[in-house]
């Protein structure tokens, strides 16, 4: 009896020349509580192990890693739908990566607070805006478009 044999798919070029891309996506997360400067928090898939994360950071991003600690965060189970059935968010894994000696990481300030504009320039701009309205239809507000 003959069996169906699956041969590996032919790809052009040697295996050393191919670029390996992982199926994992990791998220850098701002920690909720204060952590040491050499510790970084990630949200990783449930299938990813400590060794996978260490290799991911060291091989792809050239980040020296001293230790990796993981925990499973259970998803929230409080929401209910229109039939009063509980809706559970999926579980996810949280990884705490301790960087090698001398390495520090501070989370970037992505949204710096802007200084609120003083009201004086607004008062100066108001007459200019009134004059710049459409001169063909005086007395009609600009929001009332034709």
From Swiss-Prot:
Q: Where in the cell is it found?
A: Mitochondrion
One GO cellular component assignment for this chain's record is: mitochondrial large ribosomal subunit
Tell me the keywords, alphabetical order.
Mitochondrion, Ribonucleoprotein, Ribosomal protein
Q: Which domain of life is it from?
A: Eukaryota
One GO term under biological process is: mitochondrial translation
Similarity field: Belongs to the universal ribosomal protein uL23 family.
Subunit notes for this chain?
Component of the mitochondrial ribosome large subunit (39S) which comprises a 16S rRNA and about 50 distinct proteins.
Q: What is this protein called?
A: Large ribosomal subunit protein uL23m
Organism of provenance:
Mus musculus (Mouse)
Please spell out the taxonomic lineage of the organism that makes this protein: Eukaryota, Metazoa, Chordata, Craniata, Vertebrata
Name of the coding gene: Mrpl23
